[in-house]
Swiss-Prot record:
One BP term from GO: establishment of mitochondrion localization
Topology term for the membrane: Multi-pass membrane protein
InterPro entries: Mdm10
Top-rank taxon, per record: Eukaryota
GO CC, any one term: ERMES complex
Entry remark concerning the domains of this protein: Lacks alpha-helical transmembrane segments, suggesting that it resides in the membrane via beta-sheet conformations similar to those predicted for other outer membrane proteins and porin.
Name of protein: Mitochondrial distribution and morphology protein 10
PANTHER family in UniProt: MITOCHONDRIAL DISTRIBUTION AND MORPHOLOGY PROTEIN 10 (PTHR28035:SF1)
A Pfam family of this chain: MDM10
Role noted for this protein: Component of the ERMES/MDM complex, which serves as a molecular tether to connect the endoplasmic reticulum and mitochondria. Components of this complex are involved in the control of mitochondrial shape and protein biogenesis and may function in phospholipid exchange. mdm10 is involved in the late assembly steps of the general translocase of the mitochondrial outer membrane (TOM complex). Functions in the tom40-specific route of the assembly of outer membrane beta-barrel proteins, including the association of tom40 with the receptor tom22 and small TOM proteins.
Family: Belongs to the MDM10 family.
Sorted UniProt keywords: Membrane, Mitochondrion, Mitochondrion outer membrane, Transmembrane, Transmembrane beta strand
Length: 459
């Protein structure tokens, strides 16, 4: 489940019309949400608040062997007036990412209201969208994470991320720190990301290309696109450590028009299309990624069988070590509706009417029940999701996320043998699903990986 600050950053991207799907880093986002989800560690409590439309705070307290926690602050020049902040009102599907429906590429909005350079306004609301976020993790060694995000233009975004860790108490050296700079350029048809990290002076580039018509030059009579094929690649180089890395990938996904039969053209004046074509299919996403340097090949297939049920699978193979990885997972959403009687309007005299009915019950006849119109009952809908993930070594993860009263609760458990045979595979594959696979103890002695509960409340 996303924490409150990640949810606010998601609202910032939506408010500034930034497409998160049009990036190479989001190529396998659907499979990662269904297969690489994390379970809570022990007990953790989150208290958050959107104090003003521009300022948010969050506090975290957890027990992982010892008491730890964090304090977070966020400021944005873009007001979050239309972003629900109460934990009872936040849509659960935004906090619990699952199957991610890829949207068709769109051209950047040229008359972007948050760019003072484009509309030549000097009011505070017309300033370029900027977000500042800082998190302090405690206890020692204290770690500070800071984020600076700024929309330079409708097609460009600048991100600065800083991570600083305080040294040992007796050490007189300066705290270790690293800076990651990322410049993103998105035109709808393609996107480029340029990265630089002070850690080993690492340079990087990521790019994604969408096949098909250019959204910047739309045709008036063009039919809605039913699918999207994207190709991308990334490359990294460090002159200090002589580190070289690269990967490439493909993604094929259905678009919302393919899952709605009514959106398909049903008739036309041309004779060739006299027969109605009702096109409707299940939303699905296919990806293929290749890392030539490590010889890793990975394919994923994700399917939304119904609005409340999704499946995903991943198969990986390493041509150098001949090791393979197979992971399968699913998510099941459950909606429960409780009949709640509508609240009657209270004018403050109901207590007096009850007294009169008690005193004159026999003298004053009550009106027939049929003459009094019944108040319609209201439906109170609550959602919850159950995620299950299993790999070829029978390591199982179960995660339940839902809303209890006004609290957001996430409970998970990890099961599996203590030995994990595919640890070498996960170390050689970028973004593998074995991040939590390592466990202690002898093989076969324990099947418990961990259990935890996370409780969140926001206002």
């Amino acid at each position: 489940m996303l924490d409150f600050m990640e949810y606010i950053q998601l609202g910032f991207a939506e408010a500034t019309n930034w497409n998160r799907d049009n990036s190479y880093s989001s190529l396998t986002a659907t499979a990662q949400s269904l297969l690489d989800f994390k379970t809570p560690e022990r007990l953790r409590v989150h208290l958050s608040s959107l104090s003003t439309p521009h300022f948010a705070t969050s506090y975290t307290l957890g027990t992982v062997g010892l008491i730890d926690g964090s304090v977070s602050y966020l400021y944005s020049t873009v007001p979050f007036d239309h972003t629900p902040s109460r934990s009872a009102l936040i849509p659960l599907r935004k906090l619990a990412p699952g199957y991610r429906q890829v949207q068709p590429p769109v051209a950047p909005i040229e008359n972007w209201g948050w760019d003072s350079t484009l509309n030549h306004e000097t009011t505070p609301l017309a300033q370029k969208a900027t977000l500042l976020h800082a998190t302090m993790h405690m206890p020692p060694p204290t770690t500070l994470n800071a984020l600076f995000l700024r929309r330079i233009s409708p097609t460009m975004q600048l991100t600065l991320a800083v991570c600083s860790t305080r040294g040992p108490p007796l050490s007189k050296s300066a705290p270790q720190a690293s800076l990651l700079t990322q410049l993103s350029h998105d035109t709808g048809k393609y996107s480029n990301e340029y990265l630089f990290s002070t850690d080993n002076a690492l340079f990087g580039w990521r790019g994604l290309w969408n096949f098909g018509p250019d959204p910047r030059n739309p045709a008036d009579d063009a039919a809605p696109r039913l699918s999207l094929l994207s190709a991308g690649a990334e490359a990294y180089y460090s002159p200090v450590s002589s580190l070289v890395g690269m990967s490439t990938g493909l993604r094929f996904s259905t678009l919302p028009a393919a899952t709605d039969a009514s959106s398909a053209p049903s008739s036309s004046s041309s004779p060739s299309s006299a027969t109605p074509t009702q096109i409707s299919t299940f939303p699905y996403t296919l990806t293929l990624t290749l890392t030539p340097m490590t010889g890793s090949l990975s394919t994923t297939y994700s399917l939304r069988a119904s609005p409340n049920l999704s499946f995903s699978s991943r198969f990986g193979f390493n041509v150098y070590s001949w090791e393979s990885e197979m992971v399968a997972g699913c998510e099941l959403w459950r909606q429960s509706r409780k009949r709640v009687p509508a609240e009657e309007e209270d004018d403050g005299l109901e207590w007096a009417r009850r007294k009169l009915r008690m005193m004159d019950d026999a003298a004053v006849p009550l009106p027939p029940t049929s003459s009094v119109p019944a108040e319609p009952e209201q439906d109170e809908t609550t959602e919850s999701v159950l995620k299950i993930r299993v790999d070829q070594s029978w390591n199982v993860r179960l995660l339940w996320e839902g809303r209890v009263k006004e609290l957001l609760v996430s409970a998970g458990v990890g099961l599996g043998p203590s030995s994990f045979s595919s640890s070498a595979w996960t170390n050689s594959t970028a973004g593998g699903a074995g991040g939590q696979a390592s466990g202690g103890g002898n093989a076969g002695t324990s099947y418990w990986r961990g259990v935890g509960v996370s409780v969140s409340y926001s206002s």
